[in-house]
Structure formats: structure tokens, C-alpha cells
Amino acid sequence: MNVFTSSVGSVEFDHPLLLENDLTSLSINCDDVHCSSRALCYIYDIHSSRHPSIDEHQFLRLLHGPDDAVTLGSFLKTLIWILSHDKNLPEEYRLPTIMMSSSYVKFFTEVKPRPPSTNCWTCRMSKDNLPFTVPSVKGFPPDAELYIVPISDHDGKPVKFDNRKTLYRSPSKKRHKYVISSDKPPLSARYVKYVDSSALESLPGSSPAVL
């Protein structure tokens, strides 16, 4: 598979994928099947409608080679959707789309899993999934001594710990689960006591994280 770009001459047609990347033409050859600028712009329009966060620059980088398996997977799903559900797909775009699907699926042997999101608050605040103190939590007394205690890592694997204070289950639905350790009961009824006997055992061969 080869990606061809050009910034010389007149632009083939007015489309943001070309204009925003300062290109006059863009095409891909997949096993001797030519995918034109118009076909790629058509695919971009559908992919961006399904994934609004992707812009023209990101899509061009994607065409040259996806950075991670999640990005690649979403792009392949778009190509499959076009082939299976798009009633407006021009017939001349069908074969290029098929060949692109066949070519891009091979990237799975090269891409790496996406690293954990740096937007996860618990991942940023907790070192090695250890409890950490917070100045306040809505629904608890302002003078309470509070800790956030992770009970699973970012991938959902349970975290074992040793705790000396009462734990309360957080109503948070976030992926990285945690409970709240407090020396005073909560003021809000939405927090309930959390008891997990397996989590109160120390890790073999390691020192427990004591609050």
C-alpha cells in the first residue's frame, strides 16, 4: 500500500481534507487498486461523522499508518460500515474501500495497544495504586480525614490493601474504581459502607499500604 500526496498545481477539488493539509491531490494504491482523492474525502466525511474528534490532519496521519490499535479499529469499522450499510456509496468507490480494508487490517501486526489515558484522575494522583489523601470530598464533614483508596487498577484488576479506617463506597461510575476512607461518617446517604474481606489482605511478600 502506498500513499501519494502532492502540493503542486491546482487542487483537484474543494474539500477540507485537501485544503487543511495544503494538498492539491491525495491518493492511495492498494494492490494496484487506485483510491482517488474524491474517494478518500468521501471516506473521511463518514469517518469524521462517526468520530467527530478526528480532524483532517489526524486523518492524513491515519492514512500513512495508525498509531494504535484503537484508532485502527475505529477506522476499519468505518470502512466496514461503508461497505455494509452505506446506501449512497458510489459504485466506483466500492472496490477501493474493499482493498483499503484488506490493506489496513494488516497494520494490527505493527500497532501497539493504546497506553492508559493520562486523563484518569486516579492514575495521576495515586502512585502504584496506593491510597492518597484529599482535602475534602463532597458529602463528607469538612474536618474529616479523607483518603482515596483504589480498589482496582485502570484495567479493572483488583488492588489489595490494608486499611484501618471505615471505607465508604463512592457513587462514581468511572473505570478506575476506588473507595473513600474517612474517620467520620458521611453526611450524604448516597455513600454506603464498603466491606471486601479479600481486599483487606496484604499482598504476599510486600508491606501493606496502611492509612
Curated annotation (Swiss-Prot):
Positions the record marks as coiled coil are none
Which compartments does it reside in? Host cytoplasm
Q: Name one matching Pfam family.
A: Tenui_NS3
Would you say which domain of life the source belongs to?
A: Viruses
- Phenotype for residue 112 to G: Complete loss of RNA-binding and suppression of RNA-mediated gene silencing
Q: What InterPro entries does the database record attribute to this sequence? A: Tenui_movmnt_prot, Tenui_NS3
Q: What is its main location?
A: host cell
Q: Tell me what the record says results from residue 124 to G.
A: Complete loss of RNA-binding and suppression of RNA-mediated gene silencing
> What is its quaternary makeup?
Homodimer.
Stated family: Belongs to the tenuiviruses p3 protein family.
Could you tell me what this protein is called?
Suppressor of RNA silencing p3
Q: Highest lineage ranks of the organism?
A: Viruses, Riboviria, Orthornavirae, Negarnaviricota, Polyploviricotina
